[in-house]
Design a protein with these regions (language model features):
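Active-site-adjacent loop and "lid" segments of alpha/beta metabolic enzymes
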Residues: 1-51, 67-155
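Active-site metal-binding loops of divalent metal-dependent hydrolases
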Residues: 64
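Short acidic capping loops at alpha-helix termini that bridge into adjacent secondary structure
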Residues: 55-57
């Protein structure tokens, strides 16, 4: 994969996951989920760098709901700065995920907009550059509002 990224200059998203989609939820044992995910992604990014992939082509994704339970997902979102501190762009993809369903009392996926917006705002506040969402307009408006608050200006 590194050879393709080098040759095409395409970006690559490194997502944390243990196991396969069929068995990943049986692989949720961590001593410190934030530290372990951060180390895993940092090591994978370093391997790509050693293979010639430019740092600006590497994007880190903690893999929300991939081999993690609800509490672990919440810890990763809370402590997302552990990933943004590496200097690579970070992507958070938590839109409508089951963790939000658990937090919001079991509402179905299509009723998790508020939870998705909250995760998007937390991600941007923690330094993530990207969020993957289903409800783009609503998330963009919320993020623009957060950015104005952080700047203390509409401009």
């Amino acid at each position: 994969m590194a050879d393709v990224v080098v040759a095409t200059k395409a970006p690559i998203i490194l997502m944390h996951m243990r196991g396969t989609p069929k068995n990943m939820q049986q692989n949720c044992e961590y001593k410190d989920v934030v530290q372990e995910v951060a180390v895993y992604l940092a090591q994978r990014a370093q391997l790509l760098r050693e293979r010639g992939v430019s740092a600006d082509k590497i994007i880190l994704d903690p893999g929300i709901c991939f081999a993690k339970n609800v509490e672990q997902n919440l810890l990763l979102m809370r402590d997302l700065k552990a990933l943004t501190s590496f200097g690579y762009p970070v992507l958070l993809a938590a839109s409508r995920k089951s963790t939000l369903g658990a937090v919001l009392g079991g509402v179905p996926a299509e009723q998790r907009l508020e939870g998705t917006i909250a995760t998007s705002l937390q991600a941007i506040y923690a330094g993530a550059q990207m969020v993957r969402v289903h409800d783009v307009e609503e998330n963009v408006r919320a993020i623009r509002t957060l950015e104005a608050i952080l700047r203390g200006s509409v401009e």
